[in-house]
Amino acid sequence: MSESRWRGALLVAGTTSDAGKSVLVAGLCRMLARRGVRVAPFKAQNMSNNSVVTLDGGEIGRAQALQAAACGLEPSVRFNPVLLKPGSDRTSQLVVRGRAVTTVGARDYIEHRGHLRTVVAEELQSLRADYDVVLCEGAGSPAEINLRATDLANMGLARAADLPVLVVGDIDRGGVLAHLFGTVAVLAPEDQALIAGFVINKFRGDVSLLAPGLGQLTAMTGRPTLGVIPFAEDLWLDAEDSLGVVGDAPVGRPAPPVGDDWLRVAAIRLPRISNSTDVEALACEPGVSVRWVTDPSRLEDADLVVLPGSKSTVSDLEWLRRNGIADAIAVHAKRGGPVLGVCGGYQMLGSVIVDDVESGRGAVPGLGLLDLEVEFAPDKVLAQVRGDAHGVPVSGYEIHHGRVRRNGDPPLLHARGGAAEGSIRGAVYGTHWHGLLETDRFRRILLDDVAEHAGRTGFVTAPDTDVAAIRTAQLDLLADLVEQNLDLPALQALLGAGAPAGLPVIASDLLR
């Protein structure tokens, strides 16, 4: 197959959120990049509190940063021009081209629709001019027809840019054939004309047993299934949003310990959790068992408690108090148990949070485990950062409104230039820096300190855990799955020629 003939763009839509859109796009990106194709990802609009900072100080969804890495590219606001960061069930922070613009509700958002359509169209056109292939990812599901009028990322994008659409469904959840059929059936005829085929995700067992169902799906829709991606036990990439972070569930696939002891980590699954991927670096370590928890009883046998980031720090702090987790953290810390807070979690560990920006609650007492006072400012800090933690070079990124007004504890590290960052008091650690735990040497030092405080004398950190290499291996595994299980000639034809003409329309009462 001639690699130079890979040209064009398509949209990967899903029957539901978390159906496999992000991982399929990442796998396709990696597969094409390995073949020397100039490829870029694009998600017109993302709704997620898992984000990263670009080189120019913008903010995009974590999934698009991962897809960019799969392409061999640095993250850019071009890949995710519109980001919605939920702060409550009814409002989200609107980020356009990497910058926070305002807070919107569902009805307010309509006022921005015209401008956002222009932004999305400009960025996609620019990417298509600069790259051989642009792989677009939808948002949620195109079957949410109540949102069709304001849609920027699904059929609204496909219609505007004349993109062929692949619909992916997760068979592990059951009902995938109905989901695929129904997704097409509820669409308007003009939208149906762009649905060119299907992909089944997370299939377990003998694929030949699925063949009769796929044959019937083709007969009913006139569209082929371009591939069946098998369930991969070893695949656990960065969660795109909170749907991928399940409470009271393990993180990753823990490898056996190097020494005699395990370290047990309880990571608090906050309602408005952000950048949950910080915790995944801990789960990469052999002998470290990490669980997301929502029940205070889960903290009783934890060696380390982690408070991750939050898009609604004060609201999530109140949730901790209501359900008893705040008291459980206090008991854990009182007996010398290690606690780590990252960004919003760090702010919660302090003595007071003054928030007239996100919650409007004013001064709110923190958990009091650090001598720290934080005040929220309207402008968000967005930066890639580097520094030094006790002789170890470290790096990360900052995304927060909170400013430290007073810190009575020693710093956890120093930023480049010498500014103090973070806090440490006994076995309580805190930092505003996301991504810090991805620095391998720092993570090992921290875990050694945690093990000492927790009395896990038999725990030994592995000397060679490389989080960046693990992520790269995950992307290569995804690319292998795509390469081995998708109809690549059909995919190449779709990219080059678009959706075939004359695809049948599935009539339904909803369309009459």
Curated annotation (Swiss-Prot):
Gene3D superfamilies: 3.40.50.880, P-loop containing nucleotide triphosphate hydrolases (3.40.50.300). InterPro entries: Class_I_gatase-like, CobQ/CobB/MinD/ParA_Nub-bd_dom, CobQ_GATase1, CobQ_N, CobQ_synth, GATase_3, P-loop_NTPase. It comes from the Bacteria. Pfam families: CbiA, GATase_3. Residues 262-442 form the GATase cobBQ-type domain. GO terms for molecular function: ABC-type vitamin B12 transporter activity; catalytic activity. GO terms for biological process: cobalamin biosynthetic process. Keywords: Cobalamin biosynthesis, Glutamine amidotransferase. Pathway: Cofactor biosynthesis; adenosylcobalamin biosynthesis. The active site is at C343 (nucleophile), H434. Belongs to the CobB/CobQ family. CobQ subfamily. PANTHER family: COBYRIC ACID SYNTHASE (PTHR21343:SF1), DETHIOBIOTIN SYNTHETASE (PTHR21343). Catalyzes amidations at positions B, D, E, and G on adenosylcobyrinic A,C-diamide. NH(2) groups are provided by glutamine, and one molecule of ATP is hydrogenolyzed for each amidation. This is Cobyric acid synthase. It comes from Rhodococcus opacus (strain B4). The lineage of its organism: Bacteria, Bacillati, Actinomycetota, Actinomycetes, Mycobacteriales. The gene is cobQ.
